[in-house]
Amino acid sequence: MSEALYIFYALPYICFAIFVIGTIYRVVDWARSAVPLKIPTTSAQQPSFKFVRRTWIDKIDSPSSKFWAFVRVLFVVFLFRDLFRNTRYYIEMGGKNVDTRWLWLFAILFHYSLLVIVIRHLRFFTNPVPDFVKTLEYLDGVLGVAIVPPLLMTGVIALVALAFLWGRRILLAKERSISIPSDHLILFFMAVILVSGLLMRYIIKADLSYVKMFALSVVTFQPPSPEVLANLHWLFLIHFTFVCITIAYIPFSKVMHFAGVWFSPTRNMPNDNRRKRHVNPWDPNPELPILVREGITVAGVTYKCKKLDWDTYYEMYKDQLDEIAEKNYTLKAEEF
């Protein structure tokens, strides 16, 4: 039986390898993708006359340089600024505007609580435990000092925030209609991880000494002893398995937005169309019109010209135009 448990020792290496390879593949694929158009999404105008004052908020909303575009991405990543500004993304029946700042609040609570939880778990992988981990754990449980063990707020906050985010996808008609199975799958994984972790800490107590020995064996690449494996709690094995599966699943899910946002042209491109010409990287010779270099192929015939005049257009689509004329087809006003 103990030999079969060694699968749990190999599991994190397999899942982490899938995560690294998958993440590198997605990042390289995004980095190599050409951006044929300049499409920064802005809510402020470009710089114009010097006497037109632009605040630092305007510079973030409409970045005119790569530096301010980078600052804008930082605000998006760490403060979820776009989500905070998305206050009226749809209107309910009756003309009532729907404020979505609750979505921003619970989203930022979930992500930062999860970050604190991950940092707190470093105590299982280090010996001795770093002081900053001890300090963070103390601050996290400062409101639950009267409870043994102290109630760590981030675990509860993360679970409540996850319940809101998942309930929103289930209960709201608009969100339910655009949600796909993979959206619910990753939320299910996170729910199992959080619930099993809270159960181990407060209700079904697991022997954390064996958990730490197992964790240290994983990070030091030294297989644990059969005694350590035999004494791992079944709930910990469930918790650990879902953590590994989630890590391996990240490159194939929407969770990759943590890396994809850095490559989003609507966010990382400066809004400087008036000052700099954006050359289409797919266009090998931008000085010549595409009609001269490559032409347009219609029905197997390629037409090349300096400009698309009426005679060339009629020659290209003569058959279709004749067919329309034969059927005496005319557009009605309501069809526009």
UniProtKB/Swiss-Prot annotation:
InterPro entries: DsrM, Heme-iron_electron_transfer, NarG-like_domain, NarG-like_sf. It is found in: Cell membrane. The chain crosses the membrane at residues 4-24, 60-80, 102-122, 145-165, 184-204, 232-252. GO terms for cellular component: plasma membrane. The keyword Transmembrane helix applies. The keyword Kinase does not apply. GO terms for biological process: anaerobic electron transport chain. GO terms for molecular function: electron transfer activity; heme binding; nitrate reductase activity. Keywords: Cell membrane, Electron transport, Membrane, Oxidoreductase, Transmembrane, Transmembrane helix, Transport. It is a multi-pass membrane protein. Pfam families: Nitrate_red_gam (PF02665). It comes from the Archaea. Has menaquinol-oxidizing activity. The HmeC and HmeD subunits may together mediate electron transfer from menaquinol to an unidentified electron acceptor on the cytoplasmic side of the membrane. This is Hdr-like menaquinol oxidoreductase cytochrome b-like subunit. It comes from Archaeoglobus profundus (strain DSM 5631 / JCM 9629 / NBRC 100127 / Av18). The gene is hmeC.
